[in-house]
């Protein structure tokens, strides 16, 4: 009986070591991305060609003064946003224009009035629906996943993205 008890205890200990508990946390988020894109007060630009950059605030995660979007990095109308936080952690987000690439719309009677500072067309303001997919991260955000949706509002040489969704952290 003692040998059986030792064998069972050994097997249970081996199973516990082989399958550690994986606690994941899923939380809702709201994000705001602010990117100067043009206009007399927006130049010279500090962003590399083919990118947009600025700040990001993501509820439950934090604020960043260092976020960069690489346009068309995953296909036409599919962009990759990298948000770097003060502690060095990063969050990588795929953003897809909806219903198609750069499908900005100008509401109401705004037509071609106003300067937006971006080659999306005339009309102030312009709106673009987007879908986000959290692709991963580094540091405290390593293994992050999730996604959401929202709208980019482009007016007066500034793009402001507002999104919400859920993020899962391991």
Question: Where are the predicted features?
Answer:
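Bacterial N-terminal signal peptides that target proteins for export
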Residues: 1-8
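Cleavable N-terminal signal peptides
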Residues: 10-11, 21
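Sec/Tat signal peptide C-region and signal peptidase I cleavage site
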Residues: 17-23
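Beta-strand-enriched cores of mature, soluble protein domains
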Residues: 23-170
